[in-house]
Structure formats: structure tokens, C-alpha cells
């Protein structure tokens, strides 16, 4: 085994509860950084990475403007983006919205959904299909519905732990 100087080891996990405690002892990982869920401006920057001006876009609209529209749709707190209600350990209920569970991976998935839909439409019509506000809105809606529907089948305690949230006792979904 050869000796190495000035080596930096970086580890990442979205399941801190699954990391062996021996790895977390003092002197093993000197700096721990928690990266939370992206806020609206951070989401726009993430989407900008996947939705670029070199894609076929709606006339007169640039990719950054589409990214902003997509992010503002996701981060809306209207009934349209209400996933469920959750009961905290203290018994209080509060609304959970799509914005509360969004992640970089989810943002990428939404853009991928829109791209896939555009490719399918291009194949069907034989024409280039531009990435438009309605196309992106449909992708957000698909992600929202899939996330909302999955809430009915989860274990609340495990779900809150996996999603890095305060413990919750119950989840009440819309009928």
C-alpha cells in the first residue's frame, strides 16, 4: 500500500440513516455538509442544466424562461400542487405540496418527461416538436400525479425519514 498525501475523500448519501456509525465517528469525515431541497432559484439553475437553447424551443422563448415557468409551476402552493396532509408527532396537521418534496433528480425527471413527450410527438407527426410551456406543464402534472398517487401507499415514518423531513405519524390523501 502506497502512502498518499493531500487526498480528499468525498462521500454523499440521501440516506444518512443508513450510513454505518463507524464512518461518522470523529476524525473519519471531518466536514459534513447537508444539502437541502432546492428553492425556486436553485431549481431554475438545475433545470437550466437540462433544458438548453440547443433544443427545439417555442419561437421567441429561451430555455431559461421555460426553466423559470417550470420551476414556478412546481413551487406553487395552490390546490393544484397539494399532495396530501401530514400529521406531525405533536398531532398537528399541515399541507404538503410538490415543492416540499422536490429534488434535483425530480427536476431532471420532469425535463426528461417533456423531452420524451416531444420525441414521441415528433415521431407521430414527422415534424420537430418544440419544448413549449404546455409541454413542460404536462410533464410537471405527470410528476405531480405520480407523486401524489404514491403517497397513499407509504409508511409515514419511513417516508419522512427517507425524505429528510421531521417525523410524521399519518398521511391523509385527497379522496
Q: Which residue ranges define each predicted feature?
A:
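Alpha4-beta5-alpha5 switch/output surface of CheY-like receiver
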Residues: 18-20
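Conserved H-loop
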Residues: 14-15
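Conserved C-terminal "switch" segment of AAA+ ATPases
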Residues: 4-8, 22, 31, 36-107, ...
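C-terminal engagement/docking regions of AAA+ P-loop ATPases
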Residues: 8-10, 84-175
